[in-house]
């Protein structure tokens, strides 16, 4: 059975995601699709607008066969560790032939080359990176700058095209996926799909291909879901309407504010133990939490040229969930140690049987009695999310079985 993996967040699911699934099937000629999905917190450093069980339902109703949860440790990390966690999970299953992802650049050879260079870290690249960091650049900017100079010098590529390419978010993730495949010495074949529609950060609602950002902003500020009719698959619109009519609370970053401020009163000194905090950044964040009156104010006060909005927002989510209580810096350097099943259809059940025969890691359809440290963070993520979204029970992980949808 030819199986393709995809790495997704669905925050929320929209037409671009449906297009991705459809193109994945046609390009890879696969018989089944496994989606590794961020759970209740997503990589931009925010609670998911809807919970992971509803996201699983959205995925299964739109062409995915098996949904696995990306542990919170990886989903609340930089692109590098987000990609490594997800790719290592797919690799460990022992059944995945292709990894299909969207990017602004369709040149898979160039993306693979960039990933390989970043994994191998030639001396010339390391020296330039060190220089750019000394100049005060953020790590992501410094590394992108070093990679651009290396490619232009070693491979005679055009400066402007590389600069533009390295500033686009889906390209950045695509390169990290390729880097992770190189690091794992994986035989999984990377496949790139050209991203269409509005840019990732666009706030404009386009009739057909709107960004997740624009849809989230709309849901935050408007009550009329019908205006999203052309931006979402019909079944997704129905799910969101049903949730809205049942007084389901769509979840946004602002809801974190009182909990963060309260925790900061007693445990602010622990911020320095979070995995993405360095060079005194904890002092800026602790001060921001004391003085800010809104979530955006916290980030705008704490961020600098070197520490971007997304990094600060991830740190805030890590603090909210208690990442400082575990050795997360070590944990996230390791391969994903388990696969937790969130849902599947009939084809997904066949894939699951195949995985159980080939996987090098345990596959959980129900929670084990003794959770390892990484799984403990997943459980804490749901408990924390239940404070923000009152429709989710504190012990939801324990009372929810994988969602099973018959594919007709």
Swiss-Prot record:
Source domain of life: Bacteria
Query: According to the UniProt entry, what is the EC number of this protein?
Result: 6.3.4.-
Q: Name one Pfam family in it.
A: HIGH_NTase1
Give the matching InterPro entries: Rossmann-like_a/b/a_fold, tRNA(Met)_cyd_acetate_ligase
Q: Which residues bind ATP?
A: 7-20, 102, 170, 195-196
Q: Which reaction does it catalyse?
A: cytidine(34) in elongator tRNA(Met) + acetate + ATP = N(4)-acetylcytidine(34) in elongator tRNA(Met) + AMP + diphosphate
Q: Name one GO molecular function term.
A: tRNA binding
If you read the UniProt record, what top EC class would you report for this enzyme, in one word?
A: ligase
Q: What are the annotated GO cellular component locations?
A: cytoplasm
What PANTHER family does its record include?
TRNA(MET) CYTIDINE ACETATE LIGASE
Can you tell me which family this protein belongs to?
Answer: Belongs to the TmcAL family.
Q: Report the protein's function.
A: Catalyzes the formation of N(4)-acetylcytidine (ac(4)C) at the wobble position of elongator tRNA(Met), using acetate and ATP as substrates. First activates an acetate ion to form acetyladenylate (Ac-AMP) and then transfers the acetyl group to tRNA to form ac(4)C34.
Against NCBIfam families, the record matches this protein to: PRK13670.1
Q: What is this protein called?
A: tRNA(Met) cytidine acetate ligase
């Amino acid at each position: 059975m030819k199986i393709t993996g995809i790495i997704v967040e669905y925050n929320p699911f929209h037409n671009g995601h449906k297009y991705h699934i459809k193109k994945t099937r046609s390009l890879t000629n696969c018989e089944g699709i496994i989606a590794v999905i961020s759970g209740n917190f997503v990589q931009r450093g925010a609670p998911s607008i809807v919970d992971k069980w509803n996201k699983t339902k959205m995925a299964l109703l739109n062409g995915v066969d098996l949904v696995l949860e990306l542990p919170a440790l990886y989903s609340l990390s930089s692109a590098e560790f987000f990609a490594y966690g997800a790719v290592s999970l797919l690799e460990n299953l022992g059944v995945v032939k292709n990894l299909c992802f969207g990017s602004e650049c369709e040149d898979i050879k160039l993306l693979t080359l960039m990933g390989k260079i970043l994994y191998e870290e030639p001396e010339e690249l390391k020296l330039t990176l060190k220089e750019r960091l000394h100049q005060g650049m953020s790590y992501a900017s410094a590394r992108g700058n070093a990679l651009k100079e290396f490619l232009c010098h070693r491979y005679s590529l055009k400066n402007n095209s590389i600069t533009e390419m390295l500033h686009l978010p889906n390209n950045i993730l695509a390169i990290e996926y390729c880097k992770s495949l190189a690091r794992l010495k994986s035989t999984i074949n990377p496949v790139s799909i050209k991203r269409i529609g509005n840019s990732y950060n666009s706030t404009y609602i386009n009739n057909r291909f709107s960004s997740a950002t624009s849809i989230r902003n709309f849901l935050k500020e408007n009550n009329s879901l019908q205006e999203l009719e052309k931006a979402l698959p019909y079944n997704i619109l129905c799910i969101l309407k049903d949730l809205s009519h049942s007084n389901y609370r769509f979840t946004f970053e602002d809801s974190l504010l009182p909990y963060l401020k309260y925790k900061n009163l007693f445990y602010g000194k622990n911020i320095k133990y979070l995995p993405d905090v360095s060079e005194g950044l904890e002092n800026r964040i602790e001060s921001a939490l004391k003085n800010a009156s809104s979530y955006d104010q916290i980030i705008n006060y704490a961020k600098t040229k070197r520490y971007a909005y997304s990094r600060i927002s991830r740190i805030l989510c890590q603090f909210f969930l208690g990442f400082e209580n575990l050795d997360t810096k070590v944990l996230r350097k390791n391969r994903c140690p388990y696969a937790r099943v969130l849902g599947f259809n009939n084809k997904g059940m066949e894939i699951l049987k195949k995985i159980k025969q080939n996987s090098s890691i345990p596959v959980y359809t129900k929670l084990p009695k003794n959770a390892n440290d990484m799984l403990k963070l997943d459980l804490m993520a749901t408990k924390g999310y239940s404070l923000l979204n009152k429709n989710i029970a504190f012990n939801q992980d324990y009372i929810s079985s994988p969602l099973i949808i018959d594919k007709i």
